[in-house]
């Protein structure tokens, strides 16, 4: 958490799209009319479009009034304005709680708090739901089982809503003292059936536990665990997740759960939601904050839904919190995807909703299958793409006021947000010697900033190029910058960068002319992505920042003059030894050589010592991967040991059968019966000199005569 991205490598092609940017100074329908506490989104896909529900308060969590908004989208990128689906609800005067002695409700509005937002019925009806709780003061809990009740209404295909009904009453409330009727009073029989399906579904009741009456018999597991979600395992059992990475399994569809409920080993998660989902390709993913803070937002993958083996980045940006407030937390948080039964998007990808700083609403699209590494270098002609959604090799960060879009042949980054920026990243195969080229155009040269960074797998930038607001194209070197040239607004430049991790430098060419040579300002082992960003890096908040921000930032709702940048024809290539390798990289298998080197003392050293074994293997051997690790280990051990038998002789390389001297070998300790085996194995080595010289030694080593 020292770094906002956790120094995690992103999965390939994640698109982070902001739906709502809170704005108290300039309220309008696009920002929920100025309410600045926005949080806890829910997601469904039904009848060919996305449905996104979230709750809102004017400024503070648990401080009324409160309401629930709904947005829709055909493609996940363009969204309707928030529409009130559950309006503010008045708490009856005189309402009391045992936990708040001496306090009574007077002209009080309820607080909405729900952990589930949608249900698609067996007959295909879409039901949305919310819950009215009560907070008598800002430190009271609206999810303490002492609320008013849970409400439902139908969302129809034409976008209209049905009437609001209560589906569940908390103690002390019923149809006589509430403002909406009980669902069974509806004359729509299919709607009534849909509501009854919800009540009969234990997996939905598990998501009601926080707001429901304590010890209510309809709740299968009456524990204080929060933010339940679940998915189906390959054998039909149900795996569950709660805050703090608590887990359990049900073998009967959710009616009973294994006890005790335990923390998932290896998962780091604090008091924040964790989302788990079975993906369209049959694998599993969890999306959560892997720290004691609510950043970064990461994804972990599993083949069976039980053992998770990876951790990569989804959203690693934290904007300044523009509006302080009660219980507002920094970071991308409370992720929730599409619950089983609530639809599968047309693209089959993983879509995850969440809030940032509990004020801005976001969604992420994660391509499925989830790719952790780029399989090929960039050769990107944006004119071949019709929509931004087609750029599945690019990671996109697109706020409302700093959008990323396509414009013909150009990938366009705009920015009028003083607190945020547009950002795109192209992940590439990790390269030590890298060539990058692209066309670049700035819409202005008197405002705005565009930074271009070259980063390793941990997000460490080794070098940065920058278009400044003063019309200068410069390169960062340590704490200083080197001005390379002036740039003009509207002019297209062809930029080439040649980077070497061995030499620790970057050479920059513009329109074929070298304009700069700078040392890296941070050493890296390799480069795996190129980033274009319309702003400077952010480091606030830190791990030492106080949890509660009580102030608003000056100008929180104001805009800056629009700056615009365009990039096109992005190409990368590598001069690395394994640059032509599409999938397997030696670094993923180098640990075998390290392990073998440590197994025993090296008492006999020939042409290639153990200290050079890994380097030699990287240069020469074909790579192999298989699920059975002992097979894989044996494969690399064979190459490691073959290398030990390569021997330098006065007539060239030879290959011994035994390391120790044998009485029946020739003068170089070679044995003729093994030559066929040596040739058969050595023909796979990339450098032909070994095989050529081994054969030459046998056939010409004694001037063509028999070896002695």
Predicted regions and their residues:
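Asp-box/BNR beta-propeller blade signature and adjacent active/binding-site loops
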Residues: 1-376
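Substrate-binding groove/exosite segments of carbohydrate-active enzymes
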Residues: 34-35, 39, 53, 222-226, ...
